[in-house]
Regions:
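Conserved core of the sugar-phosphate nucleotidyltransferase
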Residues: 32-117
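Short phosphate-binding loop-to-helix
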Residues: 1-25, 29-42
């Protein structure tokens, strides 16, 4: 079961309009800045897309080779691919994906009805299901520093240091 499936389960228990915007904040991204969420809402309102997500600049070569740091390839602010390790993609067109999504309740219902795509299964990236079924994904560029998500024990250690610095 994907994060999108869990969001649908929760959203279905609410009385939402079909065009109601739902923000899906991934649990492994606990340090999501409020201004990024607000930017997503604004960009969703001002751009034609089925799904909205976010990314920011890749900070190091370590990010490029880290499979837990998902990269997004985009053209004119629309995602064309997501990957864990780039192969032949121009590095200047890649950015680090941030685990947040937005979509209407109507689109969410359609997304969860889709079968997982082969690429989604192989790479364990649910957003590939959206792309592989021709759903447009607008990528908001976030220019501020954002604490990395938590995928490994090293990430937990980094999160603890980050939280200690914030106190």
């Amino acid at each position: 079961i994907s994060g999108t499936d869990r969001v649908f389960e929760a959203a279905s228990s609410l009385s939402l309009n079909e065009d109601q915007l739902i923000i899906n904040l991934q649990g492994d991204e606990p340090f999501m800045p409020v201004d990024l969420i607000n930017t997503l809402v604004d960009d969703y309102t001002n751009n034609e897309c089925d799904v909205i997500t976010a990314s920011h600049a890749i900070e190091s070569n370590q990010d490029i080779v880290n499979p837990n740091c998902v990269k997004v390839l985009s053209e004119s602010s629309y995602a064309t691919d997501f990957m864990r390790i780039p192969s032949n993609e121009p590095l200047e067109l890649l950015s680090r994906h941030i685990g947040i999504y937005g979509y209407s309740f109507e689109t969410l219902k359609k997304l969860v009805a889709l079968e997982p795509s082969e690429r989604e299964i192989n790479l364990k990236l649910e957003q590939l299901r959206f792309l592989d079924n021709k759903y447009s994904i607008y990528v908001s560029q976030y220019r501020k520093i954002i604490q990395s998500g938590i995928d490994t024990s090293d990430d937990v250690d980094a999160a603890v240091l980050y939280l200690n610095d914030q106190c």
